[in-house]
Amino acid sequence: MGTVSSRRSWWPLPLLLLLLLGPAGARAQEDEDGDYEELVLALRSEEDGLAEAPEHGATATFHRCAKDPWRLPGTYVVVLKEETHRSQSERTARRLQAQAARRGYLTKILHVFHDLLPGFLVKMSGDLLELALKLPHVDYIEEDSSVFAQSIPWNLERITPPRYRADEYQPPDGGSLVEVYLLDTSIQSDHREIEGRVMVTDFENVPEEDGTRFHRQASKCDSHGTHLAGVVSGRDAGVAKGASMRSLRVLNCQGKGTVSGTLIGLEFIRKSQLVQPVGPLVVLMPLAGGYSRVLNAACQRLARAGVVLVTAAGNFRDDACLYSPASAPEVITVGATNAQDQPVTLGTLGTNFGRCVDLFAPGEDIIGASSDCSTCFVSQSGTSQAAAHVAGIAAMMLSVEPELTLAELRQRLIHFSAKDVINEVWFPEDQRVLTPNLVAALPPSTHGAGWQLFCRTVWSAHSGPTRMATAIARCAPDEELLSCSSFSRSGKRRGERMEAQGGKLVCRAHNAFGGEGVCAIARCCLLPQANCSVHTAPPAGSGMGTRVLCHQQVHVLTGCSSHWEVEDLGTHKPPVLRPRGQPNQCVGHREASIHASCCRAPGLECKVKEHGIPAPQEQVTVACEEGWTLTGCSALPGTSHVLGAYAVDNTCVVRSRDISTTGSTSEEAMAAVAICCRRRHLAQASQELQ
């Protein structure tokens, strides 16, 4: 007792006053935070046991949701630096509690992350943020925020290749080798559609429902999760009828959850993977919240551990890059279309769009299991349903080829999608070029796909308008950057170049004086055993122009790019190709630096294809033939009217300004120049490399 009295004499005055609150207030505090008193008793010993860190300015950063109504102030995810040891995570949390107590504040550590990322979840006053940001090992702190379910049988026919279509949907493989984790509401697991196919885990991390009169009817609480489980693996209305599922409850009966709850759910999956490794694993996240750095980082960690993550793009008729986890590059992000392959409209809102969307899938009036009874069905709409379709397709593809990486799976999903079927007028004008015109479909066959050259186009975020502003587009870790281009709506840009960053090539685009910003466009391909390099020629300064070659005989040209250090009155003349004579060279303006992407890989061969027009038009295109894949796209000759060149599926598109306002002449005709590549059969390629 004497020892306890001694410790009490050390308590800060504000804490002492807090403990002397009236009985009603004390009981309320005890009900809400039952272990606070135990924490207070330990604070003094914590202070004695922890050496004070030297005072220093905060180098960590603070982040919070851009949408104020979704913010949850008072709860924060403290993310520690990458190299932080497990013991240091717990020590940092204790240090925060001890230093907060000295200032008269109570804190509560809600969760310590170890397996997903180093850090912890803490309940504390926002007044302590400055203190927390100065703690050793802290990388950044993010305020918790809300996430929401994204839902407001033509669908099975739409995703099935014609050769499999019949009176009944019968996929080639049911996804029996794959396990799908669903982060959603609770599930009615005894529904006939999913009975025996879904295991409801004991994981639950949800906020309280809003409103004191909310009644938690089972049918309401289970509605969203039950429907999506049926879409993924239902006996009658499911995509991957053989896939097994595990459900984690991260959304409450109103379809609302938190970023922190989702993080803890993802860590639960990671722990399960570590304890009992299984075959291919797909995680379906049919939810969306405001942009979250920590949620995107967690998705990256899980993806690099071999997990395929599929998420809803969101139902806000907005740029998907403003939401998480939709904006995470490692996640397969899915928008929603209707039976006519058009974007889904949900009242005044609808599917999200933009460069962060990978593809679209059926998401309107989708028939699935209803939680009203064990034999009931209901139709629901939204990007949640679209994501469930892609999760089912992914499960089936992984069941056939379980060794597929995330990059290989994504490339196959894109390659086998239905193309150019969506009416782009539905999207805002500035988003049409960025949004993929792809609707998911099952591959007709995987035979021979291993030697197919798969490529996709990755757009960067739009740069700022300053002269020195740049934009960077990156490929996935398992992909090769084969070419780099740029696009500016004003036409004022200083070009682009491929450069090394963090051991990987990236595509960097440069804005010009008076420009409105620029986008970088990377052509990212799967090219196993590739040896690629970038050859650069500085400005020639005189003569016909600057030119650069792929010097090695076994290397082929996959892309050309150029950039200017100094503006030429805001114009840009990108590199051109001379297919006659020396096809392995890029030729550009004499005042520009020219870059050639040169690669060697088994069976790789490339050729140049050009399509010109006698007078300027707003757009000119050239496409690679069947069996060839577009790797590079540029403009010829590249006058000041050219806005940029970019790849859309297997077509090179060159855009120019509205010719009615530019006073163009026939001397300013332009052409689209494509580099088309393919990989020949293994036996033939092996002979050539010997």
Curated annotation (Swiss-Prot):
Residues 1-28 form the signal peptide. Residues 75-147 form the Inhibitor I9 domain. One of its GO terms (molecular function) is low-density lipoprotein particle binding. The keyword tRNA-binding does not apply. This is Proprotein convertase subtilisin/kexin type 9. It is found in: Cytoplasm; Secreted; Endosome; Lysosome. The active site is at D184, H224, S384. One of its GO terms (biological process) is apoptotic process. The keyword Transferase does not apply. Its proteolytic activity is autoinhibited by the non-covalent binding of the propeptide to the catalytic domain. Inhibited by EGTA. It comes from the Eukaryota. Its EC number is 3.4.21.-. Glycans are attached at N531. Residues 448-690 are annotated as: C-terminal domain. Belongs to the peptidase S8 family. Monomer. Can self-associate to form dimers and higher multimers which may have increased LDLR degrading activity. The precursor protein but not the mature protein may form multimers. Interacts with APOB, VLDLR, LRP8/APOER2 and BACE1. The full-length immature form (pro-PCSK9) interacts with SCNN1A, SCNN1B and SCNN1G. The pro-PCSK9 form (via C-terminal domain) interacts with LDLR. Interacts (via the C-terminal domain) with ANXA2 (via repeat Annexin 1); the interaction inhibits the degradation of LDLR. Disulfide bonds join C221-C253, C321-C356, C455-C525, C475-C524, C484-C507, C532-C599, C550-C598, C560-C586, C606-C677, C624-C676, C633-C652. The C-terminal domain (CRD) is essential for the LDLR-binding and degrading activities. The modification Sulfotyrosine is found at Y36. Residues 153-459 form the Peptidase S8 domain. PROSITE patterns: SUBTILASE. Residues 29-150 form a propeptide.
